[in-house]
Amino acid sequence: MKKVLLFSSLFLLSTLMVFAYETIIIKFPDRENWVKAYYKKVGLEAILQYVPAGQGSNNWTKSVVVHSYNQSTYPISVFLTNSTAKLLKANPTAGYKTLRLTDNDAIVGRCTKNYGKIQAQCEIFRVTRGYEGIVTIHYMNKDKDDFMENYNQWYNIIKRAKLYNSYYRDERMLDKAEYFEL
């Protein structure tokens, strides 16, 4: 009887993992109204953008972008290096500082200057290993003074963004955090 119970339990747990979907929870500042400006899932990639209320996906001063790359097996350091190379190609004025680097998670701070038609911005960029691949989380701000003034708050928000597997599509968070399917 114990073997049947054990087998049934293992089967149930493995079945639940198949039907789970990866989500992310981001807790935005309490007194700021951030809204979803863009979400698209195509194949193995999903991208989500949040902006302050009244701004849009192409017209923003601050933005949080989450991009998931399901089944991506790159080492975090390689993914970060490739991302930085793309940024430098688009805007060679970029400077960055590695703030945290482990095998499964990295955070860098970086700023650019105006370059051609590209407006200057500063960002906190996190690359993390999820359950199903790699997830990047960007906080971007086009106002360097505001970025520096609120740096610690946003560093902690991005650092504390949490990935987890959800088993119910109508699951609700008990706090004010935002979440979406990756």
Predicted regions and their residues:
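Short, surface-exposed coil-to-beta transition loops
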Residues: Y21, E45-L48, G116-F125, N150
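Signature of long, low-cysteine stretches enriched in small and polar/charged residues
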Residues: L88-T128
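Secretory pathway targeting signatures of secreted, lumenal, and periplasmic proteins
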Residues: E32-S72
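Surface-exposed amphipathic alpha-helical segments
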Residues: T136-L182
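Short conserved aromatic/hydrophobic patches within beta-strands of well-structured domains
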Residues: T23-K40, A161
